[in-house]
Amino acid sequence: MKKMSRNVLLQMEEEEDDDDGDIVLENLGQTIVPDLGSLESQHDFRTPEFEEFNGKPDSLFFNDGQRRIDFVLVYEDESRKETNKKGTNEKQRRKRQAYESNLICHGLQLEATRSVLDDKLVFVKVHAPWEVLCTYAEIMHIKLPLKPNDLKNRSSAFGTLNWFTKVLSVDESIIKPEQEFFTAPFEKNRMNDFYIVDRDAFFNPATRSRIVYFILSRVKYQVINNVSKFGINRLVNSGIYKAAFPLHDCKFRRQSEDPSCPNERYLLYREWAHPRSIYKKQPLDLIRKYYGEKIGIYFAWLGYYTQMLLLAAVVGVACFLYGYLNQDNCTWSKEVCHPDIGGKIIMCPQCDRLCPFWKLNITCESSKKLCIFDSFGTLVFAVFMGVWVTLFLEFWKRRQAELEYEWDTVELQQEEQARPEYEARCTHVVINEITQEEERIPFTAWGKCIRITLCASAVFFWILLIIASVIGIIVYRLSVFIVFSAKLPKNINGTDPIQKYLTPQTATSITASIISFIIIMILNTIYEKVAIMITNFELPRTQTDYENSLTMKMFLFQFVNYYSSCFYIAFFKGKFVGYPGDPVYWLGKYRNEECDPGGCLLELTTQLTIIMGGKAIWNNIQEVLLPWIMNLIGRFHRVSGSEKITPRWEQDYHLQPMGKLGLFYEYLEMIIQFGFVTLFVASFPLAPLLALVNNILEIRVDAWKLTTQFRRLVPEKAQDIGAWQPIMQGIAILAVVTNAMIIAFTSDMIPRLVYYWSFSVPPYGDHTSYTMEGYINNTLSIFKVADFKNKSKGNPYSDLGNHTTCRYRDFRYPPGHPQEYKHNIYYWHVIAAKLAFIIVMEHVIYSVKFFISYAIPDVSKRTKSKIQREKYLTQKLLHENHLKDMTKNMGVIAERMIEAVDNNLRPKSE
């Protein structure tokens, strides 16, 4: 799970917290005192209670055993630091104390404890009492239980296969199903309407941590030039606090001895993250309960994507086996390898001067491999994948709608608050057109226009830099091909082991793919920082807006970075090369690359294999080894105190912090993989299989990291997968075009079909029946050696003997023809067939896609009914409760009125 270092995030802070400013103290009335003078002289200053560790390592409570720890703040005691440069420590202490004082003023309760292993560290435990939870639950529009849900779930559709699905499902005796409730946004004045059996259990730990984090993110601690500074994120980034996190509930390897601990972390590790559970379904409800909806929806999506990949992988393997089993029947490959056909065809040099003439049969092995991938099965698989991706997206929408209902996120958009970073910049006052009330915004319409323009320009500039790197790879390919052509063994018979498997084209393709992969990894590191800086400057209002904006920028960068080399090989290489007598030069110096006689499809397959495989290996190294090694190093440094009993908060502190963007990079990794699986699948039918194996491991690796290597994430709400959904839809539409063009222009399928149906028989051919015999000879044009220009004339070798002509891959008239070296009739037939194929394939697949999209509703009828039923019952329940309250109140009022009337009518005593 990739993350950015604290130093990187520090550099991206737009304002430093080292500036002098007024320390801010707040009371419950939100009064801000800007001029406090010396903090030590303030009687209003409040500090957390210091308590010694009580020796209970699994405790999740304050020392009193009653107040639950909802969040932990960690700082290094300034009085015990070794250095104090220019009063920096004193400034940090003042800000921290002001911040903690304001937390107490907001109703939070704090308790401080020194570290057991390092007495410089102080852990501040934060508890939110009932009144604070209720107040902010209403502010945040958090949905809470009204009454148990009495709607019955539909029985399983698998019927007799229940025994099989039961094996794959989570054991309900271990992870008990959560009770479902009707819910509504919490309101304090309707507290009696809610299902409050136990106040301590009404707000679950994830909700408590979410509320506390909301408060921590908005409490002020300093004012500089009338601009407030607030929030725990800024304090952590500036080093005032070393960490801030909610607690895991127990150790992951064994259950807690504390009877009040739910042991959810242990259950997640045992039934989800452990390798022995790799075949089981994910406990999504428990994941959502422990980590929040945002983490839950990611694993739900990844699991569903992986399930759908199973079908694609099966069909892909079938198409691969079809090509593999039929490669011995590949007539054109036999002609390439035949000593009397391919062994006697002299091919023209593919570069100037240094490149030799060569015999066609040295490409025998590559032609055999090409038969596996360039077969009829490839066409079938490309059409299938065009339909598969639509089915996946449509069925995922339905599954997502079910999760929205089950997890109470149907109307989540009403809950989201502005980001603290946005609120801190709101200095301009405008009139809201809807409410006609004053509101603060960070910049005017003109300022917003300038920011958007600058951000768009920056994105465009960096995309151009990526394209420049791709051009550099192309220049490398053009240059190194000449070197390999001159240096590799020149055994023209193709029997030397090196020459047999390592042709100049193959060597160039492999080395260029490896270098391209290395450059991609380097550029990724740079572009991550750039995209975050641009998005921070753009200043989106909500966290969803921020993530969606960053998502689009990162995807644009990654799209160009990962796919540009594949697009070059698929659609540009070998397409604009001219012919030996008049070659086309790149940048006026480098002669354009040519494809093998069988086309560039095998090279595209090689590129995809190296990038997909290398990316998977590199990501696993980053995701598994790095956190494990960092934690191992941390344990090694703490070995001196290993015999001491350490509390839960200190154990969690020594875990790795999650990156600021959470699972953003996990989504990005999977979407890039989704692009490889769909955009170029016509050249590599095994891509879904590789993706399937990777994702099965990815789910468990991510689960293992979250439960064992990382601190607990702050639970967050999420309704869907955000901007990734339209990105996948865009990829799905583009994939139809790319696969149609790969089959038409990159593979040799269309020229073979044209030859088989038109040019193998009269009037163009000499055969009496449709056949592929003679295809190679028909697709290689003749060039007269004497027509070479001095610049491009090849380097002949004595092994070839005397020859006056050579062959090259194109459809042109031979020398001596009235239209010598012009495109012949075969060329125009092939072009017409390619264009017709693209039009037909696109229209057929798009028609099927649109029909499927129309036929499959985004929300199932049953889910719609359940949502409407719950809304109806919720409104009915609230209405009934409201009537009861009204009746009760009216009864009280009526009694008082009757009593007043009686008092007025009663005769006064004389």
Swiss-Prot record:
Side Extracellular, residues: 322-375, 477-509, 573-601, 744-836
Listed Pfam families: Anoct_dimer, Anoctamin
Single GO BP term: positive regulation of monoatomic ion transmembrane transport
Cytoplasmic side: 1-300, 397-455, 531-551, 622-663, 706-722, 858-910
Regulation: Exhibits synergistic gating by Ca(2+) and voltage. Inhibited by some non-specific cation channel blockers such as: ruthenium red, 2-aminoethyl diphenylborinate (2APB), gadolinium and cadmium ions.
Induction: (Microbial infection) Expression is induced by SARS coronavirus-2/SARS-CoV-2 spike protein.
Disulfide bonds: C330-C371, C337-C364, C348-C806, C351-C355, C595-C600
Subunit structure: Homodimer.
Name assigned to this protein: Anoctamin-6
Taxonomic lineage: Eukaryota, Metazoa, Chordata, Craniata, Vertebrata
